[in-house]
Amino acid sequence: MKKKGVQGSRLKVQGGRQPSLNLEPRTLNRAADLLFEIGTEELPAAYLPSLIEQLGLKAKALLAQHHFTCRSDAVEAFGTPRRLVLVVRGLDPVRRQPSQQIRGPAKAVAYDKAGKPTPALLGFLRSRGGTLKQTKIVSSEKGEHVYFIKPATETRTVEVLGNPLLGDPLGQLIAQLHAPKTMRWDESNTRFARPIRWLLALYGSTPLVGMRPGITSAGGQTRSQPGRLTRLGRPQGLREVRVASVSGYFQALQRAGIILDQRQRRSRIEQAVSRLAARVGGRISPEMVSHGLLDEVTHLVEVPVPLAGGFDATYLTLPREVLLASMAKHQRVFAMEAQGKLLPNFVAILEGKPKRPAGVKRVIERILNARLADSLLFWKEDHARLPLTRMAESLSGVSFHEKLGSMAEKSVRLRALAEPLAEAWKLTDEECGLLRKACQLAKADLVSTMVKEFPTLQGVVGKYYASDSGEPAAVAEAIEEQYLPAPHPGGAGPSRLPRTLIGSALAIVDKYDTLSSYFGLGIVPSGDQDPFALRRAAQGIVEVAWAVHRALPLDQCWRARVSMEPFRATAPKDAAGAGHRIHRYLLERLYAFAWPSPVPTADCIDAVLASPCDDLIDAMDRIVSLQRLTGHPGLRKAAKVIERTRNILKGAPLRQPQVDPARLTEPPERKLWDVYASNRERVACLAAERSYGDATMLFGELFFEPLHEFFDRVLVNVPDESLQQNRLALMQAIHTLYTERIADLSKLTLLQREEIL
């Protein structure tokens, strides 16, 4: 099979001409359900969630595009490893296309000097199937053009669906379903995630026979039963089943034990596992849900059948995470626990009921015990190589990136980046020592056999090996916590975050090094392209920093980073630009951050990010403070002051950096200066104390009235340049007193609403 990038290809029309439709009157005069099944070879479990979602969303868009009428909640999409199914409830039997105006050639081109239609106009009408009587002249800013008035039409739904001559909505739907990898399987050049082996399309009880898949080997349709066949049974022995109606389809699936609805299938599997676990006094281990095994198994089977088994209790001496990884990765079986401890039992989910359950159980148990024996061997081999500091010496052989050196070099960078963070957090000498040790050992477990076998256990294995090497508990915990945030066990609740200060620091510097390293190589996330998970790294920095709520000095971190690869040989100007891009990217993550209530609006974040933001946490505190003031008159007053000073300064050539009080001659400007001079320290002190709400209220109360009087009675842009510059300097002083410390309130949308103060 040939594999390529994702492309679409329209399905071929049988015979190359418009098909004759076998219309059944009983379903043509009233709304009926549409059923469309795409039968395939087994789809990868990782593809299914996206394909199901796409099927529903794109079907809704295509129905609207082709002017079909149905309820907004009428479109349902389902999927199993062997079928994708679209159901549209109560689809109108008639497709009504409204009248359309289609622009044609300009009037000057459409008619000659004698007023007769030119070949350009006649050709346009021929292409649209229209006549001269269906045209009119329309004038617009682009001139006069001839428009074809396409009349409203009504077409039976069954004549449109699947008909290539009328748009072929169902064929388009298949072509629009994308997957990470697609393939061709015959001469039709149709591309899909896996070969399509049959199509079933019914409107009520009427088959839609206008299209057939470009498949010659599967024969999903026949001349005697066009569009009515589905396939049921085991993958090795699928049998064709004739379907008389939409309701008959679901009855056939039910008789075959197929649970089509993926949500119901997931629930049934979870209930079955829980039921069998309860029989041995246990429950399903929550990690089996949070780490994705339940979702994966849901998309691996369509006839789920549970089977309970057990393994040698000797392997319970392995760490919990190792046992769970072995069971999930190799056998995809569910672990059980009681009172927080794993039991030597499991539940496997089979595809259909086996003929010899006892034999299948023995095979699964034998393979699982062998896998666990391997894991125990890895554990013992790695312990023979401890302490962890000895493992860390081998990191020079583990590549981080071909242009960024090894993991040993990354460990050196982590220690350098930890210095400004330790200073900003005011860590004690003991804490600094723990952080340096954690940076040294952070990646050491990457050379272990266990992590090579189970990459998802990096950090977890390092924690155990550090502890077994006699390292302090804080270092061991930090090695695991460097990879957080992570989903919460059980799949519910917020992300799991570092619990320790050293772990939080290591998590931040590790992600900052990764982010800055790839940005330095010009590798920046774009659209949905983010192969190195840099978005997640940046978002993780924000989440961890907010949770620990200590200063994150971006400029100091960058100064520590810029002396190392890949920036060491970079020109200072280019390096500064790279630092700015990295920090701007970090700050932009604040728009997607899970803020506490009240959630800041985008304009509130805009306002703060328009001001200096060296400390990430300080910027976030300012955002929260401003959001809490929403609706307060004091905020509107402060915003108005910033807006008016900004407007007068915009485009003005300010050449005088400071105000000369001796040249302030008018009473309103003297008054405004006195307010500024006597209160600037108060505002600055409140901002320095991070009392941003109080600073904002004070700023608005102080300057709103005096500034209003100033603009009413004093002209800034006067012919006398020295006077003009002095007044502009006064506006600049008032403006920057707030904007250089807190936010540019002119970004707030409340000013656009022209609220009366």
Cite the ranges covered by each PLM segment.
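Amphipathic alpha-helical "coupling" segments that flank catalytic cores
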Residues: 1-4, 21, 28-757
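Intrinsically disordered, low-complexity proline-rich regions
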Residues: 7-10, 14, 22-27
